[in-house]
Amino acid sequence: MRKRARKRAGEILVSRYLPRATLAAVREALVAKRKPEIRGMFGRIAHRYDLLNRMLSLGCDRGWRRAVAARVAAAGPGRLLDACTGTGDLALGQDAGAAIYGCDFSLPMLALARAKAAASATRPGWFAADVLRLPVADGALDAVTVGFGIRNFEDLEAGLAELARVLRPRGLLVILEFSTPRGRLAPALRWWVRRVPPLVGRLLSGDDEAYRYLAASVATFPDGGELCSRLAAAGFTGVRATTLTGGVATLYEGTRADDGEER
C-alpha cells in the first residue's frame, strides 16, 4: 500500500510539467478523492507539523506570520477567525485585544493548539470545523486569516465563497500560502521543497507519504495572479499578492465587497 501511495505522490510531482489548467484539475481531484485520508494524514503528522513548516519555509515562516499579524492589526478587527489553524501559531500571534477564534478539521492539531495557548497571552477560542461549512453566521467576522491551508481546500471556489460569507462587508481576508519560486534561485528552491521534507519525514517517522503530499500540493496550487483572480471572483476587492523569500510563499490580501459594489 505504501508503494502505491508513493506512486500516486510521484505522479502528482511529475505533473508540474503539465499546463497550469491541468495542474489545477489534478490538485482538486487529489484533494477531493482523498479528503478522509488527508484529515487522517494531518492527524498523524500533527506532532511534526511545525518542523515541516520550518523545512518548507527555509526557517522563514515565523517572520511570515508576523507579516500577517501586522496586516491584521492595521485593520483593527474586533472578531478574527484563523481558518485551517493547524497547531495555532497564526492565531496565537494575533493582537491579544481582539476576539480570536481558530478552527481546523484535525482534532490532533487542535489539541496541540490548545496546549500552546496555555503558555500564551493570547487565548483564542478553538473549534473543529470543515472550512467549506463553517458554523459561523453571515457577516459575523471582521477578519479571516488562512495560513498554509488554502491549498488543501476540497473545493477552492466554494471555500473562498464561504470565507466571503462569514466576513462583514469590507472585512479583511489575509492568506499566507506556499507558492512556486521564480527567479535565479527558483530551481534550487523547488528542489528543496520537493525533496527535503519527504526525506526528513522518512527519517523521523518512516512514513513519508504525508510529506510527499504536502510538497506536491505546493507544486500544483494555483498561485499568484491566478489565485488573485479567483479571490476577485469570490467577492473580494482590492486583492493583491506580495511574494516572500523569493516566491517561496505569497501573502494575499483582499476585502469583502459591499453589497452591490463592483468587483
Please state what every model-predicted region is.
Residues 142-156:
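A short SAM/SAH-binding and catalytic strip from SAM-dependent methyltransferases
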Residues 48, 57-77:
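Conserved alpha-helix/loop element of class I SAM-dependent methyltransferases that forms part
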Residues 36, 176, 180-230, 234, ...:
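C-terminal alpha-helical "lid/dimerization" subdomain adjacent to the S-adenosyl-L-methionine
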Residues 157-172:
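A short glycine-rich, Lys/Arg-flanked "PGG" loop and its adjoining helix->strand segment in the class I
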Residues 132-144:
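A short acidic, Gly/Pro-enriched loop at the edge of an enzyme's catalytic core
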